[in-house]
Amino acid sequence: MSFYVDEALAASGEVVELAVGTGRIAIPTALAGVHVIGVDSSAGMLAVCAERAREAGVAERLDLRVGDLRRPPVDERVPLVTCPFRSYLHLQDDGERLEALRAARELLRPGGRLVFDVFTPSREDIEETHGRWIEREPGIDERADWDLEAPTLTLSVRGPQGASTMTLWWVAPERWHSLLPEAGFEVLECYGWFDRRPFAGGEDSVWIARRK
């Protein structure tokens, strides 16, 4: 969380957060004094975000809009666009990835930055979790079903509030290194975690790219 807040403060301007969800990052960012335009495809999650922002006293610093990663309803041009929580993994193929990356580029001022995080699973993680229900926290179980051909992760969660399922599509870091320049970005950094350690081939990667 602090990683994205630090990036927002360094940008010195309004920030667009794609897939803002319930505001887990947007609200701390607003508390730090930054104005956030938050976009999400779920009106329900935006309603929760708005209520949390009111409770935190930062509703005036959040501008929440319903929209898609590939077509965000934003006319403003900003110094920073973020897409946290591996949200680009909801995109199913390179066509959708390029469309979303180019859309993010259009929101940026010249030299502005796109910051996002994704993952690529290790074979060990796949073997340890595939097809098994695992208790992630008391009363909440999670099951991962991996398809290496697709390649996809179908993640099922069950708990006291009910059950849900979502599918994520991942690609290797090398593919992001190719897609970003194709979409009009220069890759500035690829970290291995939010503490800014160098990427060394692990599962997680955190990207900073600049609009050309």
Go through each PLM region and give its residues:
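Conserved class I S-adenosyl-L-methionine
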Residues: S12-G21
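A short glycine-rich, Lys/Arg-flanked "PGG" loop and its adjoining helix->strand segment in the class I
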Residues: L98-P110
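Conserved alpha-helix/loop element of class I SAM-dependent methyltransferases that forms part
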Residues: M1-S12
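C-terminal lobe and adjacent flexible extensions of AdoMet/dcAdoMet transferase-like proteins
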Residues: R175-K212
